[in-house]
């Protein structure tokens, strides 16, 4: 290998030409040298190539039953929604693995792969607040190990107006994939509060609806599949900035909303809508059950435009959580609220216990508030706040017991000291 210098005879890297003094390490081979910087660069090139090969087509796609069983471990109730989502997600990723996903624009050009082209099936999730819509989507993404992003439709406006462009939704997905665009192109985007961008009136208006119908129009292309230009730093586009190009053809969109008032539209269509004393009693008790009978024309009347509805072929619903379901949510799932707080108390070396009656009262209070499962955490925080404030300053407490009176009457919880526990153990021994 070439040597330079008159007195020191410095060796050079055969690839980049840097001398041994310019690098940290120079490794010798038969007649060649390579520096640590070139080795690191080679590793990066190999990792990029391996990442391209190890795309979604190489991972084992769980069957609908397996996806459903996984959802069962974390989500209480909502059986129809879990089944629909399991099938829809399985079909979506099976379509990608089979290589039937067309490139953007091929639908318009009439290009077919193997004579049969499988279209993408985005999902519309309808149901009251606090019933697990977002949690269902998050759990799905965790099972599939794909990038997942949550967006709020209320922040979106049509391009050129104050607010977020729809492309910012795609930026969140790219960020969730650590800026790996290939990985992001097979991720899941969950858009919440989609009912808030409904048309302000059923009939088209001469005034521009930039946060309603305008947003629906702007979402059409990315829902269907297009190559979108995304500003890497978010915000508005301007002509002199660079963009990230992302193909949304294989991105699964799950859009969700409470659609308050939709049950009245469904009732009017089906002829079950009564007035005053004529209203059927079972309808008064649980209007959300009628969500299961939703038809595209009901969504059109609610304020979604036909083109938007057409890009959401899978429509599934969730229903209000009843008392037994709320009690189960507190204690049964893997990430049950009681288990979460017990783990938090364990970090301070304290055992947290709940009476069954205490869980009943918490569920009853959540029902009264009408906020579904979200109300459970708020109530738990209110109940445990005084204990969580004092407990870290005390090292004599072994366990804390929450009873029904603690929840209902704000009574102090039962605190059992370490010496009491030790005495009980000695007696039992």
From Swiss-Prot:
Any one GO CC term of the record: HslUV protease complex
Keywords noted in UniProt: ATP-binding, Chaperone, Metal-binding, Nucleotide-binding, Zinc
Gene3D superfamilies in the cross-refs: 1.10.8.60, ClpX chaperone, C4-type zinc finger domain, P-loop containing nucleotide triphosphate hydrolases
Cross-referenced InterPro entries: AAA+_ATPase, ATP-dep_Clp_protease_ClpX, ATPase_AAA_core, Clp_ATPase_C, Clp_protease_ATP-bd_su_ClpX, ClpX_bact, P-loop_NTPase, Znf_CppX_C4
Keyword Chaperone applies: yes
One biological process term in Gene Ontology: cell division
Function: ATP-dependent specificity component of the Clp protease. It directs the protease to specific substrates. Can perform chaperone functions in the absence of ClpP.
Protein name stated in the entry: ATP-dependent Clp protease ATP-binding subunit ClpX
Origin species: Arthrobacter sp. (strain FB24)
């Amino acid at each position: 290998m070439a040597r330079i210098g008159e007195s020191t005879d410095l060796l050079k890297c055969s690839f980049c030409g840097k001398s041994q003094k310019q690098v940290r390490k120079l490794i010798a081979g038969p007649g060649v040298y390579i520096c640590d910087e070139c080795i690191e660069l080679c590793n990066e090139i190999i990792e990029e190539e391996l990442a391209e090969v190890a795309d979604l087509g190489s991972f084992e796609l769980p069957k609908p039953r397996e996806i459903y069983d996984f959802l069962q471990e974390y989500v209480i109730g909502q059986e129809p929604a879990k089944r629909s989502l399991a099938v829809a997600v399985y079909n979506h990723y099976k379509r990608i693995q089979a290589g039937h996903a067309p490139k953007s624009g091929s639908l318009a050009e009439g290009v077919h792969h193997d004579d049969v082209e499988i279209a993408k099936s985005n999902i519309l999730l309808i149901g009251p607040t606090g019933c697990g819509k977002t949690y269902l989507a998050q759990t799905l993404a965790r099972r599939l190990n794909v990038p997942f992003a949550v967006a709020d439709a209320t922040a979106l406006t049509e391009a050129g107006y104050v607010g977020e462009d729809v492309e910012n939704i795609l930026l969140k997905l790219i960020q969730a994939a650590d800026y790996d665009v290939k990985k992001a192109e097979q991720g899941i985007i969950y858009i919440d509060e989609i009912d808030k961008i409904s048309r302000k009136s059923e009939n088209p208006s001469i005034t521009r609806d930039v946060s309603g119908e305008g947003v629906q129009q702007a979402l059409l292309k990315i829902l269907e599949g297009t190559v979108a230009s995304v500003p890497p730093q978010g915000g508005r586009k301007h002509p002199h900035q660079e963009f990230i190009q992302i193909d949304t053809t294989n991105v699964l969109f799950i859009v969700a909303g409470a659609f308050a008032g939709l049950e009245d539209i469904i009732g009017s269509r089906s002829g079950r809508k009564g007035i005053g004393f004529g209203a059927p009693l079972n309808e008064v008790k649980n209007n959300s059950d009628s969500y299961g009978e939703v038809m595209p024309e009901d969504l059109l009347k609610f304020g979604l435009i036909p083109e938007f509805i057409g890009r959401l072929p899978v429509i599934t619903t969730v229903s209000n959580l009843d008392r037994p379901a709320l009690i189960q949510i507190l204690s049964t799932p893997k990430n049950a609220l009681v288990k979460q707080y017990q783990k938090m108390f364990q970090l301070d070396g304290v055992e947290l216990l709940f009476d069954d009656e205490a869980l009943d009262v918490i569920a009853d209070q959540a029902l009264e508030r009408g906020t579904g499962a979200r109300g459970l955490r708020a109530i738990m925080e209110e109940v445990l706040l005084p204990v969580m404030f004092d407990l870290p300053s005390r090292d004599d407490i072994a366990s804390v017991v929450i009873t029904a009176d603690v929840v209902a009457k704000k009574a102090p919880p039962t605190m059992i000291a370490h010496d009491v526990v030790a005495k009980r153990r000695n007696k039992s021994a």
